[in-house]
Amino acid sequence: MSENNRLIWFSGRECVHCKRMRPTVEQFQAETGKKITELEVWHSEENASVMRGYGDAIKKACGGDLGVPAFFNEKTKNAVCGMVTLEKLKAWAEG
């Protein structure tokens, strides 16, 4: 997947909700063969900057905040936020 066509998962190292999403993300990848790139934003200014770059779409999906877990589709520019189901993750990835 090209650099501008990624499925991105913004997470925080100590984020309980992010840890709970890991099995869903792994199941998504196993079932679809699509990779979700995880970017940890609480301890990486570089990754946090990437997240801020997509801030408008993420804030819209997250009720006005840049929270984690958040998922951004670089191809469609769509975001989903929080604890999402496998079905919602698949729909987001398809656009």
Give the ranges of each region predicted by the language model.
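A short beta-strand-turn-helix
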Residues: 1-7
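Aromatic-flanked redox-active Cys/Sec active sites in thiol-based oxidoreductases
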Residues: 9-15
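Thiol-based oxidoreductase modules, predominantly thioredoxin-like and allied folds used
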Residues: 10, 33-52
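Cys/His/Pro-rich metal-binding microdomains
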Residues: 16-19, 72
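Typically the conserved alpha-helix immediately C-terminal to a functionally engaged Cys/Sec
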Residues: 19-32
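Structural micro-motif
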Residues: 55-72
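Non-catalytic, surface beta->alpha helical segment in thiol-disulfide oxidoreductase systems
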Residues: 67-95
